[in-house]
Amino acid sequence: MATTGTPTADRGDAAATDDPAARFQVQKHSWDGLRSIIHGSRKYSGLIVNKAPHDFQFVQKTDESGPHSHRLYYLGMPYGSRENSLLYSEIPKKVRKEALLLLSWKQMLDHFQATPHHGVYSREEELLRERKRLGVFGITSYDFHSESGLFLFQASNSLFHCRDGGKNGFMVSPMKPLEIKTQCSGPRMDPKICPADPAFFSFINNSDLWVANIETGEERRLTFCHQGLSNVLDDPKSAGVATFVIQEEFDRFTGYWWCPTASWEGSEGLKTLRILYEEVDESEVEVIHVPSPALEERKTDSYRYPRTGSKNPKIALKLAEFQTDSQGKIVSTQEKELVQPFSSLFPKVEYIARAGWTRDGKYAWAMFLDRPQQWLQLVLLPPALFIPSTENEEQRLASARAVPRNVQPYVVYEEVTNVWINVHDIFYPFPQSEGEDELCFLRANECKTGFCHLYKVTAVLKSQGYDWSEPFSPGEDEFKCPIKEEIALTSGEWEVLARHGSKIWVNEETKLVYFQGTKDTPLEHHLYVVSYEAAGEIVRLTTPGFSHSCSMSQNFDMFVSHYSSVSTPPCVHVYKLSGPDDDPLHKQPRFWASMMEAASCPPDYVPPEIFHFHTRSDVRLYGMIYKPHALQPGKKHPTVLFVYGGPQVQLVNNSFKGIKYLRLNTLASLGYAVVVIDGRGSCQRGLRFEGALKNQMGQVEIEDQVEGLQFVAEKYGFIDLSRVAIHGWSYGGFLSLMGLIHKPQVFKVAIAGAPVTVWMAYDTGYTERYMDVPENNQHGYEAGSVALHVEKLPNEPNRLLILHGFLDENVHFFHTNFLVSQLIRAGKPYQLQIYPNERHSIRCPESGEHYEVTLLHFLQEYL
C-alpha cells in the first residue's frame, strides 16, 4: 500500500496523479487468490439468481365458499432446486392488514426432472436458448388453455401435458405429467395447444409443421417443405420456423399461429381448424460454418447466415387446414397459398415481423417491414384469400376465379420514419360487430412523435373489387384503408414500453388499458392505466423509487410486480385493485401478499450511485458509479469504464444490479472505481436519442463515454484519469476497441469481449437497420469497422486483451480472427483469450469463472 501524500490543492488532476503517493495501488493477488475471491462472491449470486417466479397465469376460483379467489400459476425455482418448474400459489380472498402474508410455492409436478439427461440439448433447443438468452434449466416456457386447464410444455427432450382447474376442479397434491409419445425423430419444437379445440396441439419437427391429438395420439404432418437431408445446402425450405435473423434481431421466436376459432362445414358436421404459417426458402442465403460443440470430432455446423447487403430468405404466408370428425379423427388436411404470389401482392416486404389472428378468426393479420426497416404495414388477410396449393395451373386459376371480388388484403395501419422502426408486439384489435366495415384497435407507435405512445385507431375496410385470376401488380398505396380516427391515449417525452415482449392489458368492460412505461422517469418502469374511451388522466399503479415488471390478472382485479431498486434486491408482490366500481380508473392498488421477499445483499455489497450530467451538446445523460470500498482522502483510484453503448439496451436504471453485474461490485471491493454510462444510442430515451447512431456506429458513443468520465472525475475526485480501463462484451467489446483506437491517451487498457470488428460480416436485420446496406454507406462501414483501423492501436504490450467464444454463431469468431490477423500484419501487440466451448454468451460456470479471474488478473497487472 502506498502511503498517503496530500497533493497541494492548486495542482491539476493530472499533476496530482503524478505524485506516486496519491495513487491507490490495488493489492496484488495470486491467480489462486483471485479465484477464491470470485468463488466467495459466486456463492452468493447462486442464492438469488433465477429464483424469482415469472410467466404468470391467474385463474379465478369460482366456488363461493372457498377461501381463495385465484390460483396463480408460474415458472420458478423452488428452494434447493437447480431447475425451473411449474408451480402455483393460492391467493386468499381475505388478508390481515398488518400481517405480511408470504404465499407458499406449491409444486404442480410430482418428482419431475425436466432437464435432459446429462443436460444435453438438441441443436435446435440449444440454439433457441441462445436466441432467447436463457440460462436456466428445467421448464422454460409452457402453453396454457384456460377453459380446459390444459398445460403443455417441453422437457427432457420430449413433450408433456397435465391438467388443473377446468372441468375436473383443482388438484391438491402434485401430479405426474403425462409424456406425449411420438413417431417423430428429433425434437418437437414450439408446441402450442389449439385454442379452438384443446384436444389438438401443434409442433415443429425437422422444419415442418405437425398436429397431433392429445387424447388419441394421432399425428399428422401438415407441411412438406423439408426433406430431412443432412446437408444444409440441399434442404433450404422450412414451414412455421422463425429464421436466425427473425429470432435474433426481431424477437419473434415462432413461425406459425393458430386461428382461435373453428368453422363447421358440410352436412357431416366436419370441423375445420386453421394455422397461419410462414414458409421460408433460404436457398439464396449464404451458408457459414461454425465449429461444432463436439470439438474433438473436428466437425463444423453449417448455418444459413445472411450477411449485410446479401440475400435474405424468400418468404410467404400460407394456411394449413385440417378437418376432423366428431370423434376427433383427422379426416383431411390441406395446404393453402395466397391467391397471388406473396411477392406480387407485397413487393416491398422483406420481413414478416409479427403475425396472428383477430379474436373472431375472421382475419389473420401480419406486420410487414421493408428492407431498410423504415416502413411498416399492418395488414389483415381474410382466410378466403388463400386457395389450395397446386402444381396444376388450371386448378389454380379455377380456385382464383372462385375467390369473391370483395375478398382482399387490408392495410389498416402504416408507420414511416427516417430513423428506423423498432418492432414490438403491441397491437390489440377489438371484436367487430356483425356486418361492420370498420376495425378498431389499439397500437403503440414510436414514429409519430419520436416517443413510443398508445393510439386508438379506427380503420375503414373498403374493398376495391379484384379479379384474382388476372395477373396483378400493386399500385403505390394498394389495399390501404382510410383511417377514420386516431386518438393519442398517451403523449409526452417518455415512452410506453413496447419492445422486448412488453404487453398491454385491455379491460373492454371498463374501457381501460393497462400498460408499462417511463412516464415518471426514464430510470424506472411503472404500471399505468388510462381510459381509451375518454383519453385523459394517466394513473400510476406501482410504487415510485423502484423499477417494476408487472403482470395483470385476467379479470383486471390484481397484478403481480417483480420490482427492485439499485439498493434493494428483487421482490415479487401481489396487489389487489380496490375502490368503487363506478370509478375503475382510480381503483387503488393494495398490497395483498408476497411471493418472494428481497434477499439480503452480500456482506460487502455497496450499491452504485446514479448520476446525470449534460454533454457539451446539451444532452442529458445518466450514469452510475461504484465507489471503491477502500476510499481514503486524497487517493486516486484506477477506474474501469464498463460499457455496452449500443441500441436496445439500457444499463443505468433504478433496478438491482447485484445479480447480473455483481462483478462490478467485486471490482469496487478490490479498490477500483467502476463507471457505467448510457450514452446516445441507448434505449428508453426516444427514437432521436437512440437514432444518434444512424449510419455511424462507433463514431459518437466514445465521445459521450469520455465526457462522462471527465464529469465523474471532477465530481468525485477519486478517479485516476491516467489509469482507466474500458471493458464490455458484444457491442461493448466493439466500443472497447473503438476507445483504444480513438482515445489511447484516455484509456490505458481495453478488454474486448466477443466484438464485432467488421460490420460487413454481421447480419442483415441488425446491421442494415442501423447502418443501411454497405453500398449506400461505405464511409460508415469503414469508419465503424475496428479491424480496418489497427494501425491506430498502441505499440505498447499489455494494453489490449480480446476474449471470444469459439462457437459463437451470432458474432462469429471470424471477427476476432480477422482482427488478430490485421494486428499481426500491422505488428501490434495483443493478448487473446479463447473459450473453445462457448457461444456468444458464456454459459459454463468454469468458463465464466475463468473469464472473471482473467479480467481481475489483467487489471491488477497492467492498469
From Swiss-Prot:
It comes from Homo sapiens. Inhibited by the serine proteinase inhibitor 4-(2-aminoethyl)benzenesulphonyl fluoride (AEBSF), and by di-isopropylfluorophosphate. Inhibited by Val-boroPro (Talabostat, PT-100), a non-selective inhibitor, which triggers pyroptosis in monocytes and macrophages. Val-boroPro inhibits activity by binding to the active site, mimicking a substrate-bound state, thereby displacing the C-terminal fragment of NLRP1, leading to activation of the NLRP1 inflammasome. Pfam families: Dpp_8_9_N, DPPIV_N, Peptidase_S9. The gene is DPP9. This is Dipeptidyl peptidase 9. The active site is at S730, D808, H840. One of its GO terms (cellular component) is cell leading edge. Homodimer. Forms a ternary complex with NLRP1, composed of a DPP9 homodimer, one full-length NLRP1 protein, and one cleaved C-terminus of NLRP1 (NACHT, LRR and PYD domains-containing protein 1, C-terminus). Forms a ternary complex with CARD8, composed of a DPP9 homodimer, one full-length NLRP1 protein, and one cleaved C-terminus of CARD8 (Caspase recruitment domain-containing protein 8, C-terminus). In the ternary complex, only one subunit of the DPP9 homodimer is bound to NLRP1 or CARD8. Dipeptidyl peptidase that cleaves off N-terminal dipeptides from proteins having a Pro or Ala residue at position 2. Acts as a key inhibitor of caspase-1-dependent monocyte and macrophage pyroptosis in resting cells by preventing activation of NLRP1 and CARD8. Sequesters the cleaved C-terminal part of NLRP1 and CARD8, which respectively constitute the active part of the NLRP1 and CARD8 inflammasomes, in a ternary complex, thereby preventing their oligomerization and activation. Keywords: Acetylation, Aminopeptidase, Cytoplasm, Disease variant, Hydrolase, Nucleus, Protease, Serine protease. One of its GO terms (molecular function) is aminopeptidase activity. InterPro entries: AB_hydrolase_fold, Dpp_8/9_N, Peptidase_S9_cat, Peptidase_S9B_N, Serine_Prot_S9B/DPPIV. It comes from the Eukaryota. The modification N-acetylalanine is found at A2. Its EC number is 3.4.14.5. It is linked to Hatipoglu immunodeficiency syndrome: An autosomal recessive immunologic disorder manifesting in infancy or early childhood, and characterized by failure to thrive, short stature, skin pigmentation abnormalities, pancytopenia, and susceptibility to recurrent infections. One of its GO terms (biological process) is negative regulation of programmed cell death. Residues 1-20 are annotated as: Disordered. It catalyses: Release of an N-terminal dipeptide, Xaa-Yaa-|-Zaa-, from a polypeptide, preferentially when Yaa is Pro, provided Zaa is neither Pro nor hydroxyproline. Optimum pH is 7.5-8.5. Little activity below pH 6.5. Belongs to the peptidase S9B family. DPPIV subfamily. Ubiquitously expressed, with highest levels in liver, heart and muscle, and lowest levels in brain. Val-boroPro binds at S730.
